[in-house]
Amino acid sequence: MATLESLTFDNGFARLPETYYARVCPTPVPDPYLVCYSPEALSLLDLDATELKRPETIETLAGNRLLPGMDAIAALYAGHQFGHYVPQLGDGRAILLGEVRNRAGEGWEIQLKGAGRTPYSRGGDGRAVLRSSIREFLCSEAMHALDIPTTRALAVVGSDHPVYREDEETAALVTRLAPSFVRFGSFEVFYYRNQVEPIRHLADYVIARYYPELKTLADPYPEFLRQVSLRTAELMAQWQAVGFSHGVMNTDNMSILGLTLDYGPFGFLDAFDPGFVCNHSDTGGRYAFDQQPDVAAWNLTKLAQALVPLMSVETASQAISEYPQAFGRAYLARMAAKFGLAPGDDTVPLITDALQLLAGNRVDYTIFLRKLCAFDSQADAGNAPLRDLFLDRAAFDAWAVRYGAALRQHGQPDAERAATMRTRNPKYILRNYLAENAIRRAADLRDYSEVERLHRLLARPFDEQPAFEAYAAEPPDWAKRIEVSCSS
C-alpha cells in the first residue's frame, strides 16, 4: 500500500485563479493523537490502517505538517442561511490540503475541518471540537454504508488544546474526502458581486471535471444546472426514505455533485414525526424533516439565479423544472421498495396511510420498517410483533388487511420479499443517543472503543449482527432530552 508521502497530488481547484480561495496553512495543534479512522475511506487513497501507526501521518492529519505536492487553501463562497443572503462565508475552519489521484484514476480532495483560522473565519477560532468531529465522522461513514451520496471521513485526530464553546472543550480535526467541495454558494458569491467571468470559469471547471459528458454540447450550462437539480432530487429522496434530517440546509451546505455535505446538528428519525426539527437553533422549523424536499427546491432556484448570467431566466427556470417530478419518482421508488411493493399509483395510498399511522401512534420509523420485512401476507390479523408497536391496533389491522392483499397480488413469496426488503430497510442507524454515548466515553474517559464499535456496526446497517441487538432498540427516555445545535 501507499504512504501519504507517496501520494500523487493533482490540485485542480488550487490551479484556478485566487478569486476562488485564499492560500492559508493550517494552525498546528499540540500533541495530536488518533481518535478513530475509516479503513474504507483510507482505501480511497490507496492507504491502509498501518499508515495511521506512523507519527508523521498523525502530524499531517493534525495540520502540523504539509507534504510536498500539497497546496493548502480555504475556499470562498457565500450562501442563503435560513433564507437570508450572507455575502461572504467561505471555509472558516476547513482547509483543503490538495487533491489526490488514486490508482483507479479517481480524484479525492483532502480537507481538514477544524484546521485553524482562515481569512473567512469571521471572528471564529477556526477550530472544531471533539464531539462534533466524532458525530461527523460516524455519520459520514454511516451514510455511505446506507448507499447515500456523501462526503467521506477518513479520520479524527484530537488534541488537548482547549476550545471554548458553551463550555471548555478540546480540539479535534476531521479529515474529509470528496471529489469536490464546490457548493451552490460557490456560484452565488460572484452573482451578488456582479462578476460574470468567475461564474463562467467555475462552471467550466466543474463541467470539465465532474460532468465531462456535457463538454461536447454547444451550450452546456443549462444541462449542467438540470443535472445538478436531478442529483439533488435523488439525494432528497434518499434522505426522506431513510429518515435523515440534515438540520442546516443553507445553500452553502448544498453540494454541486449531489452529496450530503457538512454534518452539523443532523438527526435520524426515532418516532416518526414529519415535523421533526433536529437543530435546536432552528426555532422556526425551516429545516424540519418534511420541509427538506421543498427547501432543496428553493435552494435550486438560488443556484439557477446565480447561473442566470450564463443563460436566460427562462432557460434557468426550465433547467430546474423537472425537480418536483424527479423527486416524486425517486421517493416513490425507494419507499415502494422499502414496503416490498412495485412503485405504482395504487401503492401511494398504502404508503401514505402507513406513515400517518406511524405519526399518529408515535411508532419508531426504522423499527417499523425492519419488522415489516417479516410481514406474513397470509395472516391479515396476525403479525403480532409489528401490531404491538401501535396503540390503535384496530387501525393497524385495517391497514394490514390492505397491505397483505397488495403483497398477495404482487405475487412474490414472503421469504424472497423479506430478504429483498432487508437490503432496503436498515436495522441500525446512527441514533443521537448512540453517538452521545460514544462521545461521552471519548471526552470523559479518553476511551474510543465505543466510537470504533459504532463505526463497525454502522458499516453493515442492513445485516442482523445479533451481538449488537441492543443498538437496534428504541432510544431510552433520557435520549429525548438530547439537543444538538450549530455550535461545534
Swiss-Prot record:
InterPro entries, per the entry: SelO (IPR003846)
Residues that coordinate or bind Mg(2+): 253, 262
Active site (UniProt): 252 (proton acceptor)
Pfam families noted in UniProt: SelO
Cofactor(s) listed in the protein's UniProt record: Mg(2+); Mn(2+)
Domain of life: Bacteria
EC number(s) stated in the UniProt entry for this protein: 2.7.7.-, 2.7.7.108
Residues engaged in binding ATP: 90, 92-93, 113, 125-126, 176, 183, 262
Keywords: ATP-binding, Magnesium, Manganese, Metal-binding, Nucleotide-binding, Nucleotidyltransferase, Transferase
Catalytic activity: L-seryl-[protein] + ATP = 3-O-(5'-adenylyl)-L-seryl-[protein] + diphosphate; L-threonyl-[protein] + ATP = 3-O-(5'-adenylyl)-L-threonyl-[protein] + diphosphate; L-tyrosyl-[protein] + ATP = O-(5'-adenylyl)-L-tyrosyl-[protein] + diphosphate; L-histidyl-[protein] + UTP = N(tele)-(5'-uridylyl)-L-histidyl-[protein] + diphosphate
GO molecular function: AMPylase activity; ATP binding; magnesium ion binding
Entry similarity comment: Belongs to the SELO family.
Reported function: Nucleotidyltransferase involved in the post-translational modification of proteins. It can catalyze the addition of adenosine monophosphate (AMP) or uridine monophosphate (UMP) to a protein, resulting in modifications known as AMPylation and UMPylation.
Full protein name: Protein nucleotidyltransferase YdiU
Organism in which the protein naturally occurs: Thiobacillus denitrificans (strain ATCC 25259 / T1)
Gene name linked to the record: ydiU
